[in-house]
C-alpha cells in the first residue's frame, strides 16, 4: 500500500504546533498583530487555514500562545540564572539570553508597544506580565539589599520598574541598531545600583 503525500507530510500534533508558533513568532514580530493574517501564517507553515485553526481557534489565541511560549523560555532561564546569582549578574545573563533570541525579542517589543491600546488582544496579558516581573525583580533587590550588595536607599518597587524600563528600552534600540551594545550599557547602569566600599571600608556612591 502506497501512502499519500498528505499522510507522509503529516506531523505529530506537538511538532506541528511548535512549527506554527515559530512561524507566528516571526510573523507577529515583523508585522504586528494586524499586519499578518492566519492565512499568511498557514501558508508559511505549509498547511491550510482550517488546519491551523485545528491547533489555534483564532489569531488572538495564537498570539497569546506565542507570547506564553516566549515567556516560558524567559522565566525558565531566569530561574536558572538567578539561582545563587546576584540581581545584577542574573539580569545581565538574561540580557545576553535575550540578545541570542532576536525573533523572540522582536515579538515582545512590537506586541508590547501595540498592547498599549486597550482593545488589543494582548493588553491584559502585558498588564499582568509587568506586575509579575516587577514583583520578581523587586524581590531580588530586597534580597541583595539585605546581603549588602545593593544600595540600601533604593526603593525596591520603584527600582524594579526602572530596571525593566531600561532593559526594554535598550532592547528596542538594539533591534533598531545592532551596533548598540545593550548588555554593556545595561551593566554600566546596574553597577550604579551596587554597594561598593573603598579600601578603608567607606561606602562609595
Regions found by a protein language model. Name each.
Residues 65, 76-105, 156-163:
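Hydrophobic alpha-helical connector segments
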Residues 1-15, 200-205:
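N-terminal intrinsically disordered/low-complexity leader segments
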Residues 119-131, 146-193, 200-205:
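Hydrophobic/aromatic-rich alpha-helical bundle segments in the mid-to-C-terminal region
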Residues 100-124:
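Amphipathic alpha-helical segments used for helix-helix packing
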Residues 60, 71, 164-168:
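Conserved acidic functional residues
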Residues 2, 16-19, 23-65:
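Helix-turn-helix
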Residues 23-30, 77, 107, 114, ...:
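Solvent-exposed, amphipathic alpha-helical segments
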Residues 68-74:
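Short, basic, alpha-helical segments at the C-terminal edge of helix-turn-helix-like DNA-binding modules
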Amino acid at each position: 500500500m502506497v501512502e499519500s503525500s498528505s499522510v507522509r507530510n503529516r506531523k505529530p500534533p506537538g511538532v506541528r504546533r511548535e512549527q506554527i508558533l515559530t512561524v507566528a513568532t516571526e510573523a507577529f514580530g515583523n508585522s504586528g498583530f494586524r499586519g499578518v493574517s492566519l492565512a499568511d501564517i498557514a501558508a508559511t507553515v505549509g498547511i491550510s487555514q482550517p488546519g491551523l485553526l485545528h491547533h489555534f481557534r483564532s489569531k488572538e489565541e495564537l498570539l497569546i500562545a506565542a507570547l506564553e511560549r516566549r515567556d516560558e523560555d524567559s522565566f525558565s532561564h531566569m530561574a536558572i540564572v538567578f539561582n545563587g546569582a546576584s540581581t545584577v549578574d542574573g539580569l545581565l545573563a538574561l540580557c545576553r539570553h535575550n540578545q541570542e533570541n532576536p525573533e523572540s525579542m522582536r515579538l515582545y517589543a512590537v506586541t508590547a508597544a501595540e498592547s498599549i491600546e486597550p482593545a488589543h488582544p494582548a493588553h491584559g496579558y502585558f498588564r499582568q506580565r509587568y506586575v509579575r516581573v516587577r514583583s520578581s525583580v523587586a524581590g531580588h533587590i530586597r534580597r541583595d539589599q539585605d546581603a549588602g550588595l545593593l544600595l540600601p536607599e533604593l526603593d525596591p518597587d520603584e527600582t524594579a520598574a526602572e530596571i525593566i524600563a531600561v532593559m526594554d528600552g535598550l532592547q528596542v534600540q538594539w533591534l533598531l541598531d545592532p551596533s548598540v551594545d545593550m548588555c554593556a550599557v545595561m551593566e554600566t547602569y546596574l553597577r550604579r545600583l551596587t554597594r561598593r566600599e573603598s579600601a578603608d571600608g567607606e561606602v562609595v556612591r
